[in-house]
Amino acid sequence: IKLSQGAKPGHGGMLMAPKVTPEIAEARGVPAYQDVISPSRHSEFSTPNELLTFASKLRDLAGGKPVGIKLCIGHPWEIISIVRAMVDSGVMLDFITVDGSEGGTGAAPVEFTDNIGSPLRDALIFVDNCLRGAGLRDRVKIAASAKIVSAYDIVRHCALAEDAFAADSLR
């Protein structure tokens, strides 16, 4: 469940017209080769507890497959409130993908790229500390997503906190 992205926190998704092939257009129910703008908020939830209810529903619909969130840490209270809701409700996310502020999308406003949100290193440590402090670190996996371009980046982020990573290409 994508909550935010490092290159454009608070902005919805934008799929540029050249990428909206007939196959993608059919799957999304939109015209081919026209920009597709997705809203920045989910209609299914607006609070951490509603997020967890939605995640649980998705997990059930997917036959028990793992469900998690992707976010760029902007306001620390956002992840703190999600972790608190997991503690209070007992409903867990299976993973949290932490996206660093190091932008990696052509759809981001230039002034946002690399400048908004927490850098991946700091964000990984923060999310790991939140989960450890709540006693949930062994139940919730952490994935990293940002400019991970080398084997060194992978080793460094694994040493910091991550259990998995997402990278477009490695050198």
Give, region by region, the residue ranges found by the protein language model:
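Glycine-rich phosphate/ribose-binding loops and adjacent secondary-structure elements
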Residues: S43-R171
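Flexible glycine-/small-residue-enriched beta->alpha junction loops
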Residues: I1-Q34
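Short glycine/proline- and acidic residue-enriched helix-loop micro-motifs
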Residues: Y33-R41
